[in-house]
């Protein structure tokens, strides 16, 4: 007869059951895309999650938290009380603030509305975490601000093999234009580190909800055609020259092919976007 105490056997079995259940609920998830503001309006924010495998749509046990540059003073961004209908690999979950929805074309239809905004003071440096409700597991972490972020970068190994999501993305969380900070890997990809895994979207950012609705965040300043950073400048000028003669390019403002009219329009709107 085994000498293993019954309580140990029961505990081990319970742990295995919980682990198996978690794999088919929500934890194999990326923080795919984040924007901290639109054209300087920091009340217009969005977070897009992406499922790494199927059966990750039972979100009722998950939360999104944001913390400041020291990894402290956490704010609840999203308390998920329900899941989303479709749990196929690669499907998204769109979480927005009310101020974000009218900035896209068509107006965004989110899966969830943010519980709280990411504070403006956290945009320079901070960390966003996708966790379980009990705060035991950090399933995904996105930190930004480079050396200005001094908090932890650790997380669960289910999405990052070494459990270390750092170093952080070197810049701030974007808020000046229409660019978002976006994970560059495939839907199935695990994290390597935030600095290498993330990049700003090129130009306008695209947002997708669980039902595959697509919402384009367009710039009200079309002359900011090179980097969508909220200012018409040298990068936009070089982008225009690089697509000279191209019809339908990002700097073809009149639709007749990038040329002298577009060049003059860009120069006439040089500087910060309105």
Language model region names:
Residues 35-38, 51-53, 68, 132, ...:
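Sec/Tat-exported extracytoplasmic proteins
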Residues 64, 78, 93-95, 128, ...:
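Hydrophobic beta-strand residues in large extracellular and virion-surface proteins
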Residues 79-103:
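Intrinsically disordered, low-complexity Pro/Gly/Ser/Thr-rich segments with frequent PxxP/GP/PP motifs
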Residues 217-274:
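Cellulosome-associated attachment modules in secreted, modular CAZymes
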């Amino acid at each position: 007869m085994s000498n293993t105490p019954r309580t140990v056997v029961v505990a081990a079995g319970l742990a295995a059951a919980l682990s198996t259940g978690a794999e088919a609920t929500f934890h194999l998830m990326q923080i795919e895309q984040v924007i901290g503001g639109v054209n300087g309006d920091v009340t217009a924010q969005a977070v897009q999650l992406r499922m790494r495998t199927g059966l990750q749509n039972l979100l009722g046990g998950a939360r999104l938290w944001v913390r400041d540059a020291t990894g402290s003073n956490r704010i609840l961004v999203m308390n998920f009380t329900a899941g989303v209908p479709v749990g196929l690999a690669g499907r998204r979950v769109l979480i927005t603030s009310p101020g974000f929805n009218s900035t896209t074309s068509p107006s965004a239809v989110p899966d969830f509305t943010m519980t709280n905004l990411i504070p403006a003071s956290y945009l320079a440096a901070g960390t966003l975490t996708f966790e379980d409700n009990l705060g035991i597991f950090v399933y995904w972490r996105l930190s930004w601000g480079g050396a200005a972020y001094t908090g932890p970068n650790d997380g669960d190994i289910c999405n990052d093999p070494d459990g270390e999501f750092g170093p952080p993305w070197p810049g701030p969380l974007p808020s000046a234009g229409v660019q978002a900070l976006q994970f560059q890997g495939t839907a199935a990809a695990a994290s390597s580190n935030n600095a290498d895994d993330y990049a700003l979207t090129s130009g306008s950012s695209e947002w997708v909800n669980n039902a595959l609705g697509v919402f384009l965040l367009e710039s009200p300043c079309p002359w900011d055609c090179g980097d969508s950073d909220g200012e018409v400048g040298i990068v936009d000028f070089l982008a225009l020259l690089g697509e000279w003669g191209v019809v339908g390019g990002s700097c073809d403002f009149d639709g007749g092919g990038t040329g002298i009219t577009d060049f003059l329009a860009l120069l006439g709107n040089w500087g910060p976007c309105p």
